[in-house]
Regions:
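A short helix-loop-beta-strand connector motif used in the catalytic cores of GNAT acetyltransferases and
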Residues: 21-37
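Conserved GNAT-fold acetyl-CoA-binding loop/helix
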Residues: 1-22
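Acyl-donor (CoA/ACP) binding surface of acyl/acetyltransferases
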Residues: 35, 39-158
Length: 158
């Protein structure tokens, strides 16, 4: 059993689906969330990212949902998007802490979080029902200082 949402296969339909999603989000949204499209250097739509749980009072934000088109996965788009989110939220929105997480067994997400300097803070057992069974949710976080220290170790991002 696969509980994932079926996405359009056609690239133009995929892009339109995300445009519709973004427009719907803007119409219903408040300032506690941001939804944006991800494009490659050629202007081709490769995915969408949803940033929500922005807490101005405590200077933190949490989870970021990201969806990269299957044909564009494992090319660094998710990592680049996360880096841009960190720069924006820490520099422009003056946030202090980024709380994130991923489903146990999602190795791509685990590798990305580690590469970006996130620290695993714990696991919520059996918290997410995915692909026919309950899985743990790995909780991790990074502070502004940790994020920018780690950024120094990564290749330049334009």
């Amino acid at each position: 059993m696969n509980d994932d949402i079926e996405l359009p296969v056609d690239v133009d339909l995929y892009k339109q689906w995300h445009i519709d999603l973004i427009q719907k989000h803007r119409a219903e949204s408040n300032s506690n969330s941001i939804l944006f499209a991800i494009e490659n250097d050629n202007g081709e739509h490769v995915g969408v990212c949803n940033l929500y749980g922005i807490d101005e009072r405590h200077g933190r934000f949490e989870p970021v949902g990201i969806e990269i088109n299957v044909s564009h996965r494992n090319k660094g788009y998710g990592t680049a998007a996360f880096r841009m989110i960190g720069r924006y939220m820490f520099n422009e929105r003056r946030m202090h802490k980024w709380n994130s997480g991923y489903v146990e067994g999602n190795n791509a997400s685990a590798v990305m979080h580690k590469k970006l300097g996130f620290i695993v803070e714990g696991v919520r057992p059996d918290s997410i029902y995915h692909d026919g069974k309950y899985r743990g949710e790995v909780m991790c976080g990074i502070t502004e200082t940790q994020f920018f220290e780690n950024e120094k170790t990564l290749p330049l991002l334009m």
